């Protein structure tokens, strides 16, 4: 993970840890003119590693975004931000996106009262995201919420930390996307 972060910059969804600055002498050797191919490849890799996608999944999202109305880049980021694993990460119910994927895969999360075990589930406005009533599920979420620093919540989400409940108000606005993409 540190190799990816050193190469691509900060990826908050992948890990909250940061490499020491100035500790990589190889990085200084790679300066110089960056080709268009390299820039596009790095931006694609940022998306893949931040959201935890395979190449095939990313291509499907690009295809869907290309067919939709509006800017393909903005629609792509909206599609990725409305995934269930990413919304759990944004709500603070998980420290990283891989951690949120694990919560979903282990059936700890309910969407509108139904168990959802697919991390790529596309959330819609007015979806209610809760934990299962089991004590173990609530304890996991409680630990994440207590240990995570309380960052500003995007305006398309609301959370009730005492009931372990989150609500998707609307589709995300482009200014709240946490990843800087060129």
Curated annotation (Swiss-Prot):
Locations listed in the record: Plastid, Chloroplast
Keyword Oxidoreductase carried by entry? no
Q: Which UniProt keywords apply?
A: Chloroplast, Plastid, Ribonucleoprotein, Ribosomal protein, RNA-binding, rRNA-binding
**Region of interest (Disordered), ranges:** 13-34
Annotated ranges, domain S4 RNA-binding: 82-143
One GO MF term: structural constituent of ribosome
UniProt xrefs under CDD domains: S4 (cd00165)
Check the record and name the PROSITE patterns matching this protein.
RIBOSOMAL_S4, S4
Q: Does the keyword section mention Cell wall biogenesis/degradation?
A: no
Q: Which GO terms describe its cellular component?
A: chloroplast; small ribosomal subunit
Q: How does it assemble?
A: Part of the 30S ribosomal subunit. Contacts protein S5. The interaction surface between S4 and S5 is involved in control of translational fidelity.
Similarity comment text for this entry: Belongs to the universal ribosomal protein uS4 family.
By what name is this protein known?
A: Small ribosomal subunit protein uS4c
Lineage start: Eukaryota, Viridiplantae, Streptophyta, Embryophyta, Tracheophyta
| Chain's gene name | rps4
């Amino acid at each position: 993970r540190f190799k990816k972060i050193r190469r691509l910059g900060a990826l908050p969804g992948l890990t909250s840890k940061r490499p020491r600055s100035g500790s990589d002498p190889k990085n200084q050797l790679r300066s110089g003119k960056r080709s268009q191919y390299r820039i596009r490849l790095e931006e694609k890799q940022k998306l893949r590693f931040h959201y935890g996608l395979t190449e095939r999944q990313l291509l499907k999202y690009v295809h869907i975004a290309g067919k939709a109305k509006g800017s393909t880049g903005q629609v792509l980021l909206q599609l990725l931000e409305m995934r269930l694993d990413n919304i759990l990460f944004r709500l603070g119910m998980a420290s990283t996106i891989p951690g949120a994927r694990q919560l979903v895969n282990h059936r700890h999360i309910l969407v509108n009262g139904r168990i959802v075990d697919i991390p790529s589930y596309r959330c819609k406005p007015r979806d209610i995201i809760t934990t299962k009533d089991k004590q173990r599920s609530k304890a996991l979420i409680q630990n994440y919420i207590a240990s995570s620093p309380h960052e500003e919540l995007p305006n398309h989400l609301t959370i009730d930390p005492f009931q372990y409940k989150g609500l998707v108000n609307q589709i995300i606005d482009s200014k709240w996307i946490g990843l800087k993409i060129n």
